[in-house]
From Swiss-Prot:
Location in the cell: Cell inner membrane
Subunit description: F-type ATPases have 2 components, CF(1) - the catalytic core - and CF(0) - the membrane proton channel. CF(1) has five subunits: alpha(3), beta(3), gamma(1), delta(1), epsilon(1). CF(0) has three main subunits: a(1), b(2) and c(9-12). The alpha and beta chains form an alternating ring which encloses part of the gamma chain. CF(1) is attached to CF(0) by a central stalk formed by the gamma and epsilon chains, while a peripheral stalk is formed by the delta and b chains.
Family note: Belongs to the ATPase A chain family.
Function: Key component of the proton channel; it plays a direct role in the translocation of protons across the membrane.
Record InterPro entries: ATP_syn_F0_a_bact/chloroplast, ATP_synth_F0_asu, ATP_synth_F0_asu_AS, F0_ATP_A_sf
Top-level taxonomy: Bacteria, Pseudomonadati, Pseudomonadota, Gammaproteobacteria, Alteromonadales
Cellular component GO terms, alphabetical: plasma membrane; proton-transporting ATP synthase complex
Bilayer-spanning residue ranges: 47-67, 107-127, 152-172, 188-208, 226-246, 247-267
GO molecular function terms listed in the Swiss-Prot or TrEMBL record: proton-transporting ATP synthase activity, rotational mechanism
NCBIfam families: ATP_synt_6_or_A, PRK05815.1-1
Protein name per Swiss-Prot or TrEMBL: ATP synthase subunit a
Keyword annotations from UniProtKB, A to Z: ATP synthesis, Cell inner membrane, Cell membrane, CF(0), Hydrogen ion transport, Ion transport, Membrane, Transmembrane, Transmembrane helix, Transport
Bilayer disposition of the protein: Multi-pass membrane protein
Amino acid sequence: MATTGDDTLTITASDYIQHHLTNAKMCSTDGGIAFNYACQDAGFWTWHIDSLLFSVGLGVLFLWLFYKVGQKATIGVPGKLQCFVEMCVEGVDKIVKDSFHGKNAVIAPLGLTIFVWVFLMNLMDLIPVDFVPEAAKRLLGVPYLKIVPTTDLNVTLGLALSVFVLIVFYSIKVKGFSGFTKELTMQPFNHWALIPINFVLETVTLIAKPISLSLRLFGNLYAGELIFILIALMPWWAQFALSVPWAIFHILVIVLQAFIFMMLTIVYLSMAHEDH
């Protein structure tokens, strides 16, 4: 059993878990704009405003931070923040040079943006599960708030679909529309009679890229968040004994998932630039 902040209302463990895994919603109804409970039957046209707020906010923070560091960069002894930024930039640049075999000045900045942005969104998972939602409830009257954008499939799928659009765009740009069509219809079996089979296989392969990207990131972060929530349901001594080791291990997951998303994006775009 779990209790609310004022200890006057007891809720079940399933209620507690469901509450922490529910997004703050906004939707349009006949009466105007509605929020949360009123959006239960709104269907597809429901905005997860907490995911939007934190993902956009962290993106702006990333841009502002790197811009400020770039302005104050010195050729002398760099500070800790400048060292971190330089390490990120040089590391991603090296990965792009090793993995991307085409010529495109966009890929390295794109890879850096994806890595840092996804990392920052993942990093929100280390904030205690009750801290921000409880503060928002008490100060703003917000009943639901999920602060980890990458535990929302809408966010991870949106990122992956953006990568998918770039894959198709550069495939057509480099190979031409006829070359892209030929790639979908004449591989892996180079015979006109097998064009339908080739088209099905290649289309499934192409569509599987954004789906696998989004589900991998979402699944790992959602599972990690769920474990933190389950730990929060335990007695205080068990919370302390389990939350610290899990948080330390989860740091690896946070970094690794950001790296994998970036790395696969670079590889997919490299494949799109290969003109057979």
